[in-house]
A protein has these predicted regions:
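Enzyme catalytic cores with a strong preference for nitrogen-chemistry domains
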Residues: 1-231
Length: 231
């Protein structure tokens, strides 16, 4: 922070349609470039893990699973980056497909924010594939050991080990939607093994989340995807 301001960055990585591994590699590369420039909030395009133009491939289970594998990879390979990072992916929840932004910080997947307003005109066909996330409120279970094993089986790199340390911008957490006069209830979405190693998570999915910094309580960030900003 300088003079009460933080630096935000928007990145547009090169992507290949349905090539989640390539796209994740580009996202990770850009995160580290942004880090070198001092960015503390990093925003990537909607559906950047799969690419936006997958069409009917969005219905392929293999694509949806690989998107989650690469989301875990992005989270873990940027665990040492002191920033709040948003990336986009398709996410299946209770039999329906959502266009979501995932908030990441220090290796944690903090929450999924679903898109509400789905364009279905001209060259846009989002309603063909996705469901509006309006009024959605629940948790998505992510077994990180399973997804970690999948991407590590395709690489010779060492295991990614990290700790979540207190720092100026550590500890973005999600807030549930608050009723009137209700006090904020911080969510601890992480299940841990006895040795403290992150094992699995139940991660909130809702359009009504605010990401706030523990060290700077007045820094509160919401995510809106494309048309949600102006409709």
């Amino acid at each position: 922070m300088k003079d009460g301001f933080i630096k935000a960055a928007a990145g547009t990585p090169d992507v290949r349609v349905a090539d989640c591994e390539f796209n994740a590699t580009e996202i990770i590369r850009m995160v580290h470039e942004m880090e070198e420039q001092g960015a503390k909030v990093m925003v990537f395009p909607e559906l950047c893990i799969t690419a936006y133009t997958c069409g009917d491939l969005f219905w392929q289970e293999n694509l949806l699973e690989e998107a989650k594998v690469q989301l875990v990879r992005i989270a873990e390979e940027t665990a040492d980056v002191d920033a709040l990072i948003f990336v986009g992916l398709p996410l299946e929840y209770k039999g329906k497909l959502y266009n979501v932004a995932a908030g990441l910080n220090h290796g944690e997947i903090l929450g999924f924010v679903p898109k509400i307003n789905l364009p279905n005109y001209n060259e846009f066909y989002e309603a063909r594939y996705f469901t509006s996330g309006e009024n959605l409120d629940g948790t998505v279970h992510i077994d990180r050991d399973v997804y970690r094993a999948r991407y590590e089986s395709d690489t010779e790199s060492d295991d990614v080990e990290f700790e979540i340390e207190m720092s100026e911008f550590d500890g973005f957490e999600e807030l549930e939607e608050l009723e009137e006069d209700e006090e904020p209830d911080y969510i601890d979405e992480n299940d841990e093994e006895e040795d403290g190693e992150l094992y699995e998570e139940d991660i909130w999915i809702s359009p009504n989340m605010i990401f706030t910094c523990e060290e700077m309580p007045k820094l509160q960030i919401a995510a809106e995807i494309c048309e949600d900003l102006w409709v």
